[in-house]
């Protein structure tokens, strides 16, 4: 029997260091990051592959965020590595300005992989002049499907400030080309006994699935000005910690040990209070762990809907002739409502007259919240006939309100996720402001936005908000959404099949929730380490 050959493309992880970078800032040091572009095709179009994090005030940065790229043996993959000092989001080489660039290095992926230890060290240049050195290390990723979840604390760490320290730690995986940074913790201020939040890493990022691969944990004291102070380090591997062979590790500072000779014991002790392998958390893991789902409904009250009292109005609504708004509320709300933890749904209006003037975000009805889908439909039927419609169709205020409210009380130990259902009949009048609010919400708010288009409009702007075309949503200042949080569906495409409407509008919610949780390193509460 012939063994089937896997046709999946290998994936390669690229990690980076730089040194001796030219300083582009006047009053401080540059804030470098590395952007990677893949030059493809006969016309040489440069495709954005990924970028590292930005490291502030550092001319010798060591980046913890890697860039992942598919490896095509059969193709020449010309890669450009551009070191920049920049604040705005960039996705195209053409968007870079000359004064943003510290330096650039171009090579092929094949050249990096074929080098001894899969490592390249080269000068970077800008306008023909050397402006620093870049070090690129490559490693093929072996997908494991597991995560390494651990929690550590420290005791009696060395004082590096007057009375205390501000400790943080770095994890390096060893390789034939040297140690490679794979994780850096947050700084805990003013303590010699730090207690860190749980950390979850993909096993392939930590050790590429090799449970005996040596890991180096370095502890440092953070200084806001000047160089950070080294506290000490220890080495171990995942197998040792998982099996509980050793859970306590003394931090050793070799220079301090040499000075103090026989009197030196350690520079503190690090304890793994728990450690385990877990699968990638699922949407159900978060729900069963206690993550609350909250539903908000926003109803378009603009004049383009037509007077609710006329039969041609999109808001014309009777028990025997429910409007498209009512049908959408019932269809989508019936699926979402069972997940709403307390059964209360907030109903908002926008584009109508509220308290004497046009409002783009107001309480729809006499109650701030109503019970279930039935309550939403009852409120809609009571309020819409007497609603004074206005204009224009603005989304900014509604999205801003929902984004802020979704953050109320949300922590890793109190997880909530909000779904904002917007029902609208027309094109957005405040497109730039709306895009800005969505981009901002994608970075910080536990929020998904479901938009249902009512009526016969073309909804071109709505399709732009929905990132399903593969292009990340970018606002006028160049900031790009870190996750896709918008799903748009025209009601008329599914008017004959309400179940299909709900399926289409809600199918991306699980991945959007997972995106927020991963972005913030929130574990399912049932997975949390004590």
Curated annotation (Swiss-Prot):
Ranges where the C2 domain occurs: 1-125, 130-253
Name assigned to this protein: Copine-B
PANTHER family from the UniProt entry: COPINE (PTHR10857), COPINE-B-RELATED (PTHR10857:SF30)
Cofactor(s) listed in the protein's UniProt record: Ca(2+)
This protein's UniProt keywords: Calcium, Metal-binding, Repeat
GO BP field: cellular response to calcium ion
Annotated binding of Ca(2+) 1, by residue: 25, 31, 85, 87
Residue ranges constituting the VWFA domain according to the UniProt record: 294-513
GO MF terms, alphabetically ordered: calcium-dependent phospholipid binding; metal ion binding
Similarity-based family: Belongs to the copine family.
GO annotation, cellular component aspect: cytosol; nucleus; plasma membrane
Residues that coordinate or bind Ca(2+) 2: 25, 85, 87, 100
Keyword Cell inner membrane in annotation: no
Top-level taxon of origin: Eukaryota
Gene: cpnB-1
């Amino acid at each position: 029997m012939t063994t089937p050959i896997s046709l999946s493309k290998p994936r390669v992880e690229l990690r980076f260091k730089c040194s001796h970078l030219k300083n582009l800032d006047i009053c401080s040091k540059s804030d470098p990051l590395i952007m990677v572009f893949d030059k493809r095709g006969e016309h040489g179009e440069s495709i954005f592959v990924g970028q590292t994090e930005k490291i502030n005030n550092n001319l010798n940065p060591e980046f913890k965020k890697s860039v992942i790229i598919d490896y095509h043996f059969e193709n020449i993959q010309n890669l450009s590595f551009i070191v920049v000092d920049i604040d705005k989001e960039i996705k195209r080489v053409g968007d870079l300005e000359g004064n943003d660039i510290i330096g650039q290095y171009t090579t092929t992926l094949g050249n990096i992989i074929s080098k001894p230890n899969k490592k390249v060290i080269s000068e970077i240049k800008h306008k023909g002049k050397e402006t620093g050195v870049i070090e690129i290390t490559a490693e093929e990723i072996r997908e494991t499907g597991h995560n390494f979840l651990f929690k550590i604390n420290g005791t009696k760490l060395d004082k590096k400030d007057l009375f205390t320290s501000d400790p943080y730690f770095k994890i390096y995986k060893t390789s034939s080309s040297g140690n490679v940074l794979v994780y850096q913790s947050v700084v805990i201020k003013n303590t010699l006994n730090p207690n860190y939040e749980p950390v979850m890493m993909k096993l392939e990022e930590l050790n590429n699935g090799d449970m005996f691969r040596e890991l180096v944990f370095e502890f440092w004291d953070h200084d806001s000005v000047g160089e950070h102070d080294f506290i000490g380090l220890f080495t171990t591997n995942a197998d040792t910690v998982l099996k509980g062979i050793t859970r306590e590790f003394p931090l050793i500072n070799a220079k301090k040990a040499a000075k103090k000779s026989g009197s030196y014991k350690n520079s503190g002790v690090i304890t793994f209070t728990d450690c385990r392998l877990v699968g990638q958390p699922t949407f159900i893991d978060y729900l069963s762990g206690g993550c609350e789902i909250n539903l908000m409904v926003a109803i378009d009250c603009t004049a383009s809907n037509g007077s609710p009292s006329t039969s041609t109005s999109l808001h014309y609504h009777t028990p025997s002739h429910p409007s498209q708004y009512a049908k959408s509320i019932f269809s989508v709300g019936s699926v979402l409502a069972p997940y709403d933890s307390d059964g209360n749904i907030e109903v908002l209006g926008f584009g109508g007259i509220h308290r004497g003037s046009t409002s783009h975000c107001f309480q729809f009805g006499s109650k701030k919240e109503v019970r279930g889908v039935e309550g939403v439909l009852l409120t809609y039927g009571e309020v819409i006939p007497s609603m004074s419609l206005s204009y224009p169709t603005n989304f900014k205020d509604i999205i801003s309100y929902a984004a802020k409210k979704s953050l109320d009380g949300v922590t890793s130990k109190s997880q909530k996720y909000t779904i904002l259902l917007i029902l609208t009949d027309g094109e957005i009048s405040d497109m730039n402001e709306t895009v800005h609010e969505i981009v901002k919400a994608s970075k910080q708010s536990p929020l998904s936005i479901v938009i249902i288009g009512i009526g016969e409009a073309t909804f071109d702007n709505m399709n732009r908000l929905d990132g399903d075309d593969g292009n990340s949503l970018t606002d006028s200042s160049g900031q790009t959404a870190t996750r896709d949080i918008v799903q748009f569906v025209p009601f008329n495409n599914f008017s004959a099949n309400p179940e299909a409407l709900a399926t289409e509008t809600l199918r991306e919610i699980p991945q959007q929730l997972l995106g927020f949780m991963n972005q913030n390193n929130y574990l399912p509460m049932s997975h949390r380490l004590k």
